[in-house]
UniProtKB/Swiss-Prot annotation:
PROSITE patterns: KH_TYPE_1, S1
Assembly and oligomerization: Component of the RNA degradosome, which is a multiprotein complex involved in RNA processing and mRNA degradation.
SMART domains, A to Z: KH, S1
Every KH domain range: 555-614
Family the UniProt entry places it in: Belongs to the polyribonucleotide nucleotidyltransferase family.
Gene for this chain: pnp
The protein's name in its UniProt record: Polyribonucleotide nucleotidyltransferase
Catalysed reaction, written as an equation: RNA(n+1) + phosphate = RNA(n) + a ribonucleoside 5'-diphosphate
Source species: Alkalilimnicola ehrlichii (strain ATCC BAA-1101 / DSM 17681 / MLHE-1)
Keyword Nucleotidyltransferase: yes
Ribosomal protein found in the keyword field: no
GO cellular component: cytosol
Domain annotation S1 motif: ranges: 624-692
Amino acid sequence: MKSVKKSFQYGNHTVTLETGGVARQADGAVLVNMSDTVVLVTAVGRKEADPGKGFFPLTVNYQERTYAAGKIPGGFFKREGRPSEKETLTCRLIDRPIRPLFPEGFYNEVQVVATVLSMNPEVDADIPALIGASAALSISGIPFDGPIGAARVGYKDGEYLLNPTFEETAASDLDLVVAGTENAVLMVESEANQLPEEAMLGAVLYGHEQMQVAIQAINELTAEAGKPRWDWHPPQGDAALETAIKDLVGDDLAAAYQIPEKQERQNRIGELRQRAVEALGENREEEGGWPEKDVGDAFKGLEKDIVRGRILAGERRIDGRDTRTVRPIDIEVGSLPRTHGSAIFTRGETQAVVVTTLGTGRDAQIIDAIEGERKEQFMLHYNFPPYCVGETGFMGTPKRREIGHGKLAKRGIEAVMPAADDCPYVIRVVSEITESNGSSSMATVCGTSLSLMDAGVPVKAPVAGIAMGLIKEDEQFAVLSDILGDEDHLGDMDFKVAGTESGVTALQMDIKIQGITREIMEQALEQAREGRLHILGEMNNAISGPRSEMSEYAPRLLTIRIDPDKIRDVIGKGGATIRALTEETGTTIDISDDGKVTIASADKAAADEARRRIELLTADVEVGTVYEGKVSKLMDFGAFVNILPGRDGLVHISQISNERVERVGDYLKEGDTVRVKVLEVDRQGRIRLSMKAVQDGE
């Protein structure tokens, strides 16, 4: 098969899609080159589904090879290990927009693998990987209702930027990734610097408009190199089974979905599901019956119809709320006595226990990313143990979902974090989800904001988050504020917004259907703003701003700046000076190459003493200034006096007294404390001192 290429201009980048030359045994394989960042994306699907499988087994793997950046991996084995956080997040980024485009009832296993082969350190590989996944699936013949396009959007000085570089993104007020088909937006992932809702919506629509060139190129590639679409037909619904289930449990199921308490409701629904299986399944006493999987699918369909129908008819939601009401909120701040900052945030049946820990510069996380090494001063970790939903399960390393939710919460908070000069601490926040019924990532945002303020971190403003949902049938739709887990599962959109009173700091959107209009997104953003302001009001009642005093158990950090040329004076020969300083004062001292000195200690007095000593070590000797010093050595011609740490000057025999001095030892001995005045510092740094000048001055 000959190689087929399609190229297009995408912002300031040229993108080339190529197929037919590499990985030819995969169902679909595309090399994407975006300004020298090259990603190979393959798609393979099994021709037969596993019998009895009731879900779509899609796997997405994204892997960055260090050779792409001309590096050799660290560690003993010198090869890539488990996925990094960036790789895990990119897997989710690819999965979310492509998953809804596989047809209902398609349960064949599909695997998409994206491998970064070459890396331009200024061009992120996530957009080429997304475009490549869309292209590989489109040419593979696997049933897929794509293609999709993807774009990164920045925002600076009132202008949108298309596919900005890493450097441009760092200077931008927005980092937004949007993916969608020709007619619809399917996924948004973003962080922003408190931007208004109109700017966020404008960025989504701008990105969708600009990605059409990528969709067109994929369509052209598919027309020229695509394989025939699989001869797959969706399973037909069984009208008789649907009617039988509705007659059997319809009224009881509708009543069950009006039980506000989650576990009681789930227990009742479980009983009804079991009743349906026993009455209509193949194992019933009478002849006939349907397979258990079919009965389960029909039961799920009835659940969906009941919940969605009630909401679209203007009736109350599952827990009795209307579409705009936020669940009751309960907040406890500072409840964990030995932590540096803590908050328990409860919204309905979702609860997060969030704890802040303050550390020093040496606690920063070193990220050895493919585009370069950096230090992370702010970490946010999200834990979702099985007990929070009343289940048992394996507990170990964080799963993809936990990493993704933690990153979303971090994006929501990052815009209000103080600059390093205002808060020199390394900060780690951990969110323990102790109860969950929808929107736990947004509970983490609220809890993190409260916990940081309890720890005394000078955040620029409090941040709250809310999850929105959507039910849409034809032209009728309802936007739901603060959705429950069931509403998320049975709805058409999951739309999470975090922000301050001034604007949005993070937006994540996952849309399961086509046809979400600008009007729907506008209403969702406006309703989210209304809910966010309500939550901020509740948070303000608990703690209105950062505490002025930190926990007594938090380290005290003092930051001073010294002349970089004097760093060696503080460190001393072989590190002797700084080692003695830390041991004698009980502090931890970090010195950066630019002369920034950070002193950490649980005892403020010890930190102050360390600062005083460092200031003395780095002080300049000023001519005309009187110092108190110790006689360090006697000579025939005078005495050396230590006036500053590491700085000795000479008091000549003629400068000891107004009287004639025959022997230095008659007036001074080693260890004496004397007051001296600096007469001169010569070009070689030698210091001339006088005791006589001090006497004359007095």
